[in-house]
Regions:
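Bacterial N-terminal signal peptides that target proteins for export
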Residues: 2-8
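N-terminal targeting/tethering segments
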Residues: 29-153, 157-158
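Cell-wall glycan
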Residues: 147-152, 159, 165-169, 174
């Protein structure tokens, strides 16, 4: 997991679990996060209404910044993460740059998993993963971002955030291959090793 948000990774958008995080070295080196204590307080005390207040302007801001639907999704995620986790106020240019980098690295991550390791996730596998996990979630931050986007939780999970869950399924299948390659079962180390593979192949 990216060390910037490892302490309380679940308070970012959607799941942003290990398989959903991207290392954005360089682009975010200057960004200051809220302290671990502040993040913990958010996680432990924020209600559904608190999250809705945080997210309420995200869709309009994203629509102003980016019209392309694929990239706009990542702009929404970047804005949501900024409002929840960052002490640094991002400029429009920074938001768009971070969103573009995250989208490109996500595609590259999946491409390497497929082409180098032969790992993909089927629609059935993704649906099952979501149905057994995210669809049963009552986490207020998930409900709030879905409501902000005028979606039900199921629509949000199976539609908007489907790519994140696809990545989680791929990781489950990819991990045993990486364990053999790197001779370790340490999840964080494996994630870092694979992120290094992505970074080596990423062209800005």
């Amino acid at each position: 997991v990216n060390k910037r948000i490892k302490p309380l990774v679940l308070i970012a958008t959607a799941v942003l679990l290990m398989a959903g995080c991207e290392t954005q070295a360089g682009s975010q080196a200057h960004i200051k996060l809220k302290s671990v204590e502040e993040q913990r307080e958010i996680l432990e005390t924020y209600t559904l209404d608190d999250y809705k207040t945080i997210y309420e302007n995200v869709p309009d801001e994203a629509n102003r910044l980016e019209k392309d639907q694929d990239l706009q999704k990542w702009v929404i995620r970047t804005l949501a993460e900024e409002k929840l986790l960052y002490d640094t106020d991002l400029s429009d240019k920074q938001v768009k740059a971070l969103a573009k980098e995250a989208m490109e690295k996500d595609k590259l991550w999946k491409s390497i998993a497929k082409k180098k390791y032969g790992v993909i996730a089927s629609d059935a596998e993704i649906d099952r993963y979501i149905e057994e996990g995210a669809d049963t979630s009552g986490l207020p931050q998930h409900l709030a971002i879905a409501a902000t986007l005028n979606m039900s939780l199921e629509e949000y999970n199976h539609g908007f955030d489907r790519d994140i869950y696809e990545k989680a399924v791929i990781w489950q299948k990819l991990k045993p291959k990486l364990e053999k390659k790197y001779n370790t079962t340490n999840n964080e180390m494996l994630a870092e090793k694979f992120d290094e593979e992505v970074e080596k192949n990423y062209k800005k």
